[in-house]
């Protein structure tokens, strides 16, 4: 039984389909790290991870310690990498829970080494290399090779992997992405020349997987990190138009009509006088608002699907509620409303909502609140 009259519906068959799409693209002997940060981009990290592991994922990737700990409580043996920054104060938690950490400096490695020695355990780490994102990482140069040698000499650490991140592989022209891979491959080869090897070497996110697996840029990679594509979205419109891989929508945002009321002509609906009734208006109230992830700016801008009919979202979206206009719509209290998701029901998908807000589907789905129950079908 639902605790609220609003929820996120997650299509598990589509999750499996999209993971299979990854497997069909990457080399047959490749390892796959399913990226499930931000509550699996809104799909629910525990259930999504369970499905990806069943389908053959070797690793899970998250952004922060709390996400990793949630997964560890359900998957005690699964390798989990924190792709984001881990403060030094988190070292003991990383070690005690057998979590892998991203490292980008000798100073941090030294602190983690000391903590590992105190606990008499080993901490697995992946070295981050900055090849052009200019966010975090060691530069791919001789100085960094010397730093890596020093990190390798530290006790208590197991350097399990090395990776970079592609910043623009979803662009129509792949020059920057290919230059990043050229720099990463050259650096890996320099390390190999000095007998420095790694169990895992990774660089390709969804954009890299969808667009760069046909060349030889990935010749030294053996681990792939799909993210947004697992949830049914292409990294960019350019990729959607040109990519032959079919991805299926996973996430739908739904709510029930909790009350229908007739509002006379000449009234304002909701906060701030943003919708004026120029006729007698049948208004449906939904228990869903911007605190749930339905952006406030969508008021008066989108249509939602009700019984395969389209109805406008009116007024400003409130923190916990919103309004739809039901004139000329066959609907009753308790009927389901699709805010975005299933195209077969005439609803917008998350990428179309994102376009209205000048953002991307990543933001539209990853900001869906945890207070919304996930319903798996």
From Swiss-Prot:
SUPFAM superfamilies attached to this UniProt entry: Alanine racemase C-terminal domain-like, PLP-binding barrel
SMART domains: Ala_racemase_C
Associated pathway: Amino-acid biosynthesis; D-alanine biosynthesis; D-alanine from L-alanine: step 1/1
Cofactor(s) listed in the protein's UniProt record: pyridoxal 5'-phosphate
UniProt record similarity statement: Belongs to the alanine racemase family.
NCBIfam families: alr
Protein name: Alanine racemase
Species of the source: Helicobacter pylori (strain G27)
Gene this protein is translated from: alr
């Amino acid at each position: 039984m639902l605790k609220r009259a609003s929820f996120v519906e997650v299509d598990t068959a589509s999750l499996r389909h999209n993971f299979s799409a990854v497997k069909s693209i990457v080399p047959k002997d490749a390892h796959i790290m399913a990226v499930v940060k931000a509550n699996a981009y809104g799909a629910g990290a525990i259930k999504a991870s369970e499905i990806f592991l069943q389908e053959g994922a070797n690793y899970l990737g998250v952004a922060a310690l709390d996400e990793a700990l949630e997964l560890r409580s359900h998957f005690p043996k699964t390798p989990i990498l924190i792709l984001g920054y881990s403060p030094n104060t988190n070292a003991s938690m990383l070690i005690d829970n057998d979590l892998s950490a991203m490292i980008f400096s000798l100073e941090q490695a030294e602190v983690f080494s000391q903590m590992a020695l105190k606990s008499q355990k080993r901490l697995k780490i992946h070295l981050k290399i900055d090849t052009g994102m200019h966010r975090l990482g060691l530069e791919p140069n001789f100085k960094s090779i010397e730093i890596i040698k020093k990190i390798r000499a530290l006790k208590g650490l197991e350097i399990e992997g090395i990776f970079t991140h592609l910043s623009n592989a979803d662009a129509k022209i792949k020059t920057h992405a290919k230059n990043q891979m050229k720099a990463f491959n050259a650096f890996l080869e320099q390390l190999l020349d000095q007998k420095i090897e790694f169990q895992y070497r990774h660089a390709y996110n969804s954009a890299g997987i969808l667009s760069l697996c046909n060349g030889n840029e990935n010749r030294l990679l053996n681990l792939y990190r799909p993210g947004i594509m697992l949830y049914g979205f292409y990294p960019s419109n350019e990729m959607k138009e040109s990519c032959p891989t079919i991805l299926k929508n996973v996430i739908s945002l739904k709510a029930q009509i909790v009350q229908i009321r007739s509002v006379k002509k000449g009234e304002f609906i909701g906060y701030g006088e943003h919708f004026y009734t120029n006729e007698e208006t049948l208004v449906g109230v939904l228990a869903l608002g911007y605190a749930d992830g339905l952006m406030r700016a969508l008021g008066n801008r989108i249509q939602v699907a009700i019984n395969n009919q389209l109805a406008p979202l009116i007024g400003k979206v409130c923190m916990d509620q919103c309004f739809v206009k039901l004139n000329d719509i066959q609907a009753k209290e308790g009927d389901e409303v699709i805010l975005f998701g299933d195209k077969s029901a005439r609803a917008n998908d998350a990428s179309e909502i994102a376009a209205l807000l000048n953002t991307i589907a990543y933001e539209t789905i990853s900001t869906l609140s945890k207070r919304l129950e996930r319903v798996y079908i």
